[in-house]
């Protein structure tokens, strides 16, 4: 409902090697927005070939900033290198984070161990700071190894919100609305379904 008037979107990929693939994902997302009544007139994709002043302009003028999935740590380094974190943190428009993008929205971001995806150890690092907790996308409540050995120890210091696949959550300031799916709080060695 609050996106109906949006006309411009800026995408920030989580993978930069295959820009044709990124463009296909962007095209799919733009089509999805159109299907729900959001007709975007300006679509921008940031990458290493985008001039810095153009990046800044695209972020500042975007009605929607869409931080895509992909390589979480590489995306974080991209945001740091071009000094985009503060701009995204302070943006007045809508910010959407998917998978890696959701992780990077946190003040303290958590990239959990996933050997299948080339992440051999769980790390925490400074994220965008748009939200004051961290998101664990693709969360599987039955993955006890991840819960017991990775997430529970970290949950003593930070709140982790676990979002299983196909979950959508709308966050406004400190409030959230579950759009679809389940939403879990992992904190102080426990898991609570919200």
Please give the residue ranges for each predicted region.
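C-terminal and late-domain segments of enzyme folds
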Residues: 1-5, 11-27, 32, 111-194
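Short loop/turn motifs at secondary-structure junctions
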Residues: 5, 37-39, 61, 156
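A short beta-strand-loop structural module common to alpha/beta enzyme folds
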Residues: 8-15, 40-46
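Structural motif
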Residues: 10, 64-68, 96-97, 135
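Extended, compositionally biased flexible segments
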Residues: 24-46
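Flexible gly/pro-rich beta->alpha loop and the following alpha-helix that scaffold active-site loops
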Residues: 41-94
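A structural signal for short, well-ordered beta-strand segments and their strand-loop junctions
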Residues: 42, 96-98, 161-163
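Class I SAM-dependent methyltransferase SAM-binding "motif I" and its flanking Rossmann-like core
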Residues: 74-78, 82-141
């Amino acid at each position: 409902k609050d996106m109906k008037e949006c006309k411009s979107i800026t995408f920030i990929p989580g993978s930069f090697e295959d820009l044709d693939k990124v463009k296909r994902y962007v095209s799919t997302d733009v089509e999805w927005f159109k299907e729900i009544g959001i007709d975007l007139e300006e679509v921008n994709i940031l990458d290493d070939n985008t001039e810095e002043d153009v990046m800044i302009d695209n972020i500042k003028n975007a009605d929607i900033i869409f931080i895509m999935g992909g390589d979480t740590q590489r995306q974080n380094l991209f945001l740091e290198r071009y000094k985009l974190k503060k701009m995204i943190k302070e943006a007045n428009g809508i910010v959407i984070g998917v998978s890696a993008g959701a992780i990077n929205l946190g003040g303290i971001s958590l990239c959990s161990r996933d050997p299948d995806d080339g992440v051999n150890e769980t790390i925490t690092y400074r994220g965008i700071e748009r939200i004051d907790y961290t998101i664990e996308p693709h969360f599987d409540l039955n993955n006890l190894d991840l819960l017991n050995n990775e997430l529970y120890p970290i949950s003593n210091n930070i709140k982790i919100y676990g979002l299983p696949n196909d979950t959508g959550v709308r966050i406004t300031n400190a409030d959230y609305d579950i759009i679809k799916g389940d939403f879990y709080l992992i904190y102080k060695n426990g898991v609570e379904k919200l």
